[in-house]
Structures are given as C-alpha cells and as structure tokens.
C-alpha cells in the first residue's frame, strides 16, 4: 500500500510530539481511555469461589473455556498493536491511544489469568487453560484467524483495521453477553464486574478502530469489509453454539447467533456499509451494555470508574475567589 496516499500513515517527525492536536476526535478517544483506567486490585474476588462451587459442571466448563480464550486473546491483540499498528500509524494522537491500549490489554490479560488462578485449584488444569491456544481447537481457530492478519504482508492497514475491529467487536461480544447472563443470576460478582470494565474498554477500542477507518482516504471496498466481518461472524457462531455451546449455561444458541449478527450489523454500519443480517438484539439485558463504548459505559458509567478531571477542560479547573458568599 502506498502510505503517502494516507495522511495518518505518512511518515512525519511530528509523531514524536503530542501538541498541537490535529485530530480532535482521535485525541478525545485517547482521553476517554485514560479516564477509564483501572487495575485488577480494584476487583473484589473474595465471594467468587463460593459461587463457583455452586455452578454445575457444564457451567464451570463453559466459563473455563471463555476465560481461557480471553486470557490468550488480549496478548494477540497486543502483538498486533506492538508489531503493526503502532509503527504504521504516524499521527501522535493515535499512537497515544495505541500505547495506552497496550497497557489496558495487559491488565485485561492479567485479570483473566487471575480469574483462572482463583477458580481452578489443580495446577495441571490451570496450565492447560493458560495454554489454550495450543490445547483447545476452538480457541486455536479464533487465535489463528487473528494471527493471520498480524502476519499478512499483502493486506492493507485498512483491511487489518477491520479485522481487529471484528476481533474486539465480534469475537468478544458473545462471550461478554454470556457472562452478563450469569450476572442476572446474582453469581460471581468479581467475574461479572471485571466483565463490565473489560467490555467497556473493548467497546472503546472497537469504536476507535471505526474512527481510524473513517480517516482513511482510500478505505477497503465495502465488499471486502463485509467479507471480513462475515468470516468473523461464522467463526464466533461456531465457537458459542458448537464448540462451547451457550446452552451449557441455559442460553438459547439460536438467540446467541442472532445476537452476534446484530453486533456485526452495527459494526458494518460504523464502517460505512449496509446491514447484512438485519437481525434485532434478542437480549434485552444487553441493551444498555452493548459494545458501543459511547454513552453506555462512558457517560452513564455503570461501574463509575473514571479518573477525576481527566475528561475536563482547562477552563473547568480555574481557581477563583470571586464567588458570592
């Protein structure tokens, strides 16, 4: 790809300094990410193990597979950011975001690893789950799909941007919904709270990919975008309805397929394409916690995790003595 055709990819020495801000929308996303910073120490897991013991074997098996996939997937996302996106994109606003995203993906991976470490007592089983990419075919399939985009030498930045929007917006969506389903039962407060925080973060990451896509002067054709999304949808459907079917936790597999299609349609719209599936959201409990990363988790903030003053303007922080008493 001729990077000189894309301003955000064109080499410039300006990438080494942050100011002046040129891309306000991209900078705003970076500040949102910073405002949402959290650490694993802020998640209370003290009540989770007693709930874990109450789950059926099917429910435990489902959660194990989900956590195993998540524990590995954040590392794959980071590999793409470190090896490809951060070095390719030349504007400092986006590089700030990607740098911070790498830190957050590390926290996500630590969180999932800690959850596995908390629930699974047998060391051999822990090791099996920590190495899910090698040990579980269903996880390996999703990992290999993402890795092929990292390693691709002939696909454009725009195409790979769509692929990783699909990873964070589609590959994660069904699993997030399944954990929110568990929350409805009032179980596993640590798991479900961390799921709120991580799904909010990933929603922002997916939104950011869509914003970067809109800054491309020569984006991939709609047909190419659609094919990438459809491929991701089919892999995710297989993951949650065949490999580790959500019926294990009492969810309807057909409705899960519909939900994945609904999420995919929304992503297609954000990427400037028409809907492909025209599916409605079958899960009312996901209406306010869907992967939009906009008002649901940032302005409304269910978890109320936003660092003080990060999103304020300089004029909001002026000290004054002219107040009437």
From Swiss-Prot:
Ribonucleoside-diphosphate reductase holoenzyme provides the precursors necessary for viral DNA synthesis. Allows virus growth in non-dividing cells. Catalyzes the biosynthesis of deoxyribonucleotides from the corresponding ribonucleotides. It catalyses: a 2'-deoxyribonucleoside 5'-diphosphate + [thioredoxin]-disulfide + H2O = a ribonucleoside 5'-diphosphate + [thioredoxin]-dithiol. The keyword Transport does not apply. Its EC number is 1.17.4.1. GO terms for molecular function: metal ion binding; ribonucleoside-diphosphate reductase activity, thioredoxin disulfide as acceptor. The active site is at residue 112. This is Ribonucleoside-diphosphate reductase small chain. It comes from Yaba-like disease virus. It is an enzyme of class 1 (oxidoreductase).
């Amino acid at each position: 790809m001729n990077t000189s055709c894309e301003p955000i990819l064109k080499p410039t020495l300006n990438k080494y300094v942050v100011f002046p801000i040129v891309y306000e929308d991209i900078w705003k996303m970076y500040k949102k990410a910073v405002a949402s910073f959290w650490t694993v120490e802020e998640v209370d897991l003290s009540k989770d193990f007693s709930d874990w013991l109450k789950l059926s074997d099917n429910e435990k098996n489902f959660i194990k597979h989900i956590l195993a996939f998540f524990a590995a997937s954040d590392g794959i996302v980071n590999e793409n950011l470190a090896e490809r996106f951060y070095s390719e994109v030349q504007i400092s606003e986006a590089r700030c975001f990607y740098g911070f995203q790498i830190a957050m993906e590390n926290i996500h991976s630590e969180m999932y690893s800690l959850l596995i470490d908390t629930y699974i007592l047998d060391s051999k089983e822990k090791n099996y789950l920590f190495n899910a990419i090698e040990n579980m075919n269903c996880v390996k399939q999703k990992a290999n799909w993402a890795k092929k985009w990292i390693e691709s030498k002939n696909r454009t930045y725009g195409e790979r941007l769509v692929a990783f929007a699909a990873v964070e917006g589609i590959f994660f969506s069904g699993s997030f919904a399944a954990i929110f389903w568990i929350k409805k039962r009032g179980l596993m407060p640590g798991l479900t709270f961390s799921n709120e925080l991580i799904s909010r973060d990933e929603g922002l990451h997916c939104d950011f990919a869509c914003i970067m896509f809109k800054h491309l002067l020569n984006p991939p054709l709609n047909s190419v975008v659609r094919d990438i999304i459809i491929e991701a949808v089919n892999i995710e459907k297989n993951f949650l309805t065949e490999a580790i079917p959500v019926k294990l936790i009492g969810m309807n597999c057909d409705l899960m397929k519909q939900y994945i299609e609904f999420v995919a349609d929304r992503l297609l719209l954000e990427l400037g394409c028409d809907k492909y599936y025209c599916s409605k959201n079958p899960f009312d409990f996901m209406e306010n916690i869907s992967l939009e990363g906009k008002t649901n988790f940032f302005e409304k903030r269910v978890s109320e995790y936003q660092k003080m003053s990060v999103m304020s303007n300089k004029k909001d922080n002026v000290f004054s003595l002219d107040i009437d008493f």
